[in-house]
Amino acid sequence: MRRVMLVVLLLASSPAWPGWVQMSSEGAGSIMYADPDTIKIDGQLRRVTELHDFKAPDKTRGNRSTKVVSEYDCKEGRIRILQEEYFSGQMGAGERLGGSTEPTDWFSLAPGTRGWTLLNFVCSR
């Protein structure tokens, strides 16, 4: 019984997905994570891999999670998406449902948003 309890405690105290740092709560129907080990620095620009994990399947694509490579402009407070991959399961698991490697246009981030939180996180590195 003690061994079972020890295993349960060890599993509960260890991170479920190494590398992912939770950046937002579930308030908006999804939780956003960033992997600090993937941050690439080029002057005022930062690239990072993010994971957007949805409570329910996305209404547009039916995916439960999206892996995103984003580029942040620390000086201008803006972001663009460089790459996206859509997955049927949570936390990037399951079948790959598609994706995009077409970079989006830059767009500004407003203070207090989840994107602003990510900008501050990656730009502090």
Give each language-model segment a name.
Residues 15-125:
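N-terminal secretory-pathway/extracellular module detecting exported/lumenal segments
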Residues 4-12:
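Sec-dependent N-terminal signal peptides
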